[in-house]
């Protein structure tokens, strides 16, 4: 059974009539904050993993600049997503791994934004094996106080995983062999980056597995 915010609030009020007025108001104020709280989600990962492309796919619009050769995100880009009665802010953050100078700047930016992030979605390429920069930055965030249970790891470019030529362009889904490859990569990433949530694969440009991603993202929110 589901309730709208107004009907839920009215029902709770009826249950609290026996409490003193001051206590009742404090409970109702807290309930209002919980219901109307807008979580903030940071999207991180190496440059070129498809963070901005994932945002564009979620919003079904080219709201974030992308480029196949150059990183386009240099500052935190805030986007508001409305899902039913719930609003949330997605923060598309600049990707690491381009230059040591940029990484130093981004560490300062990540440190500054970390306290306000309710969830961190970390994007890794499914067709790549070099995760040293990701491991180092993940450890940096943990050392800065990030909650390890607040990370959700996503494999992008699932359509390019071996053997890429077998991607089913008609059905927009991986072949059987690609599915096996994705399972192997998923297991490896889950070992390297322990998380409370399963590792998920997506192919953002063609929309593959995006509904599952959005569902998991909502589930992962506090």
Predicted regions and their residues:
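Canonical P-loop GTPase G-domain recognition
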Residues: 159-222
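Switch II of P-loop NTPase G domains
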Residues: 73-76, 93-117, 124-143
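Conserved G1/Walker A P-loop phosphate-binding module
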Residues: 2-93, 97
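Conserved beta-strand segments of the P-loop GTPase G domain that flank and frequently precede/overlap
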Residues: 121-126, 153-156, 201
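Conserved nucleotide-binding/hydrolysis micro-motifs of P-loop NTPases
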Residues: 95-97, 127-129, 157-161, 205-208
């Amino acid at each position: 059974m589901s309730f709208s915010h107004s009907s839920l609030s009215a029902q709770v009020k009826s249950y609290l009539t026996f409490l003193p007025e001051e206590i009742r108001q404090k409970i109702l104020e807290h309930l209002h904050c919980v219901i109307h709280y807008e979580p903030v989600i940071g999207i991180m990962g190496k440059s070129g993993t498809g963070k901005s492309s994932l945002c564009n796919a979620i919003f079904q619009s080219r709201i974030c600049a992308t480029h196949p050769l150059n990183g386009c995100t240099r500052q935190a880009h805030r986007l508001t997503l409305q899902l039913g009665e719930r609003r949330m802010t997605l923060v598309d953050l600049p990707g690491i791994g381009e230059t040591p100078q940029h990484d130093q700047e981004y560490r300062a930016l990540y440190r500054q934004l970390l306290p306000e992030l309710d969830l961190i979605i970390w994007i890794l390429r499914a067709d790549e094996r070099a995760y040293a920069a990701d491991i180092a930055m993940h450890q940096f965030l943990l050392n800065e106080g990030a909650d390890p249970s607040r990370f959700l790891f996503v494999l992008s470019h699932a359509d390019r995983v071996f053997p890429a030529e077998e991607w089913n362009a008609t059905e927009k889904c991986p072949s059987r062999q690609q599915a096996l490859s994705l399972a192997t990569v998923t297991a490896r990433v889950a070992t390297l980056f322990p998380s409370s949530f399963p590792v998920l694969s997506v192919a953002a440009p063609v929309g593959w597995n995006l509904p599952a991603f959005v569902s998991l993202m909502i589930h992962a929110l506090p």
